[in-house]
Amino acid sequence: MKIGLLKVGIGAALVFGMGTAALAQTPAASGGQVPASTNKLDSETRGFLTDAAESGHLEMAGSKMALEKSKNADVKQFAQKMIDDHAKVGQQLEALAKSKGFEPPKEPSMMQSAKLKALGLRDEGFDKAYVDEIGVDAHEDAVKLFEKASKEVKDPEVKQFAIETLPSLQQHLQAAKTLQQSVTAKSR
């Protein structure tokens, strides 16, 4: 029963939030005018910056939750590393985006926020869910995103950022997969 209500609530939040998400992407502070330097970034580059920022916020929020909820020292150590590393990358991404006249998101996407809410409701099995969803799945998505950007983004500075950040994300993914094996073995 609770899961059914959760699904309905998440579905409603996604449906009703779509319109506000679109409005949030318009530059209201400048009276609807897009700064001239933003016009230099093509939609693919802006999309990469948006997705990368949201991904980082997802991983940081999930990792902060893991620090609070997990009893597993290895999970907490991984979570702290994710917070530290993603905070640095997030600052670099924000500075780069702003230098291009683009304001990156300051929080995860609505869908990612729903995933975080569902993760936060878990007590039993939290560690496995965190490692699976934030450690492995989110990093697989991030690696794909940065690999694509490192090949296809036209802006040379944004492309370089993707190239330089990719090895760290690949290391995070490998560490998450190793942790996943350990956590899965302990949960059996």
Labelled PLM ranges:
Residues K2-A12, F16-R188:
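His/Met- and acidic-residue-enriched segments that coordinate or traffic transition-metal cofactors
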